């Protein structure tokens, strides 16, 4: 079970985007995540008439390692760690380590 999933609200812990918040758009491989509006780079592209693309400078979000992000706890307003517990029905659920409450994905 992945502790960080698509749709989770996260906060960046290190790097030039430290302190910024966003939602996970995609889990890439096993250890990288793509976050909307975080780690944005400018990509210079050549025009390609065969593909119908116009050349220029395009802004693109790049993946960031999951060790550099933490799940954001809305109740406390801080970054939090994720734990896994067994629910009453026997299913594994993700919980915030600080409060013990279950993490709900919006």
From Swiss-Prot:
UniProt keyword Cytoplasm, yes or no: no
Keywords: Ribonucleoprotein, Ribosomal protein, RNA-binding, rRNA-binding
A biological process term (GO) from this entry: translation
Gene3D superfamilies per the UniProt record, alphabetical: 2.30.30.30
Pfam family, one: ribosomal_L24
Top-level taxon of origin: Bacteria
CC annotations in GO: ribonucleoprotein complex; ribosome
Gene Ontology terms for molecular function: rRNA binding; structural constituent of ribosome
RNA-binding among keywords: yes
CDD domains xrefs: KOW_RPL26 (cd06089)
Its biological purpose: One of two assembly initiator proteins, it binds directly to the 5'-end of the 23S rRNA, where it nucleates assembly of the 50S subunit.
Family: Belongs to the universal ribosomal protein uL24 family.
Complexes and interactors: Part of the 50S ribosomal subunit.
Identification of the protein by name: Large ribosomal subunit protein uL24
Organism field: Albidiferax ferrireducens (strain ATCC BAA-621 / DSM 15236 / T118) (Rhodoferax ferrireducens)
